[in-house]
Regions:
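Acidic, PIN/NYN-like endoribonuclease modules and their adjacent C-terminal/linker elements
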Residues: 2, 86-99, 110-144
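Conserved glycosyltransferase catalytic-site signature
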Residues: 7, 103-107, 124-125
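Short, well-structured N-terminal submotif of metal-dependent ribonuclease cores
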Residues: 1-38, 50-67, 132
Length: 144
């Protein structure tokens, strides 16, 4: 099983002062590191969030955060998944009642994991994964 890591898990793994740093590391060491993935959206989110001057431990440098992520992605077991799911295709959704704009990115990531018959690992317990066909099965919540 391969786990597509949510940006918040990537951040927790790299930020020693993150509230979920130790839990994310424990999970990654025991399960996640065997086969894990990033994609353009999760990589972009990691770099965007951690390089913002408002992020508590930001270096303010996109280049530095790219280096941090590049080092993380050198850990064996990493895969890069290209973005190749379209949310405008009806077969992605479990109903015509689509999600709120705030959930679209994470639901896209769930759909990406579903397409590959893998898992989306996240800290977000409020994600309406039932809106994506196969979303419940693809969701892996970290036990935090």
């Amino acid at each position: 099983m391969t786990y597509l890591l949510d940006a918040n898990i990537l951040i927790a793994l790299c930020d020693e002062l993150h509230a979920h740093h130790h839990d994310a590391h424990r999970w990654f060491k025991s399960i996640g590191r065997l086969s894990w993935a990033t994609c353009p959206l999760t990589e972009n989110a990691f770099i965007r969030i951690t390089s913002k001057p408002t992020y508590p431990r930001s270096t303010g440098s996109v280049t530095e955060q790219m280096r941090v992520l590049r080092e993380l992605c050198q850990i064996p077991g990493h895969q890069f998944w290209p973005d190749d799911v379209s949310l405008v295709r009806h077969e992605v959704w479990s109903s015509s009642d689509h999600a709120s704009p705030a959930d679209l990115t994470d639901l896209y990531l769930v759909a990406l994991a579903v397409k590959r018959e893998q898992k989306f690992a996240t800290l977000d317990r409020t994600l309406p994964v039932h809106r994506i066909r196969g979303g419940q099965e693809a969701l892996h919540l970290l036990g935090i």
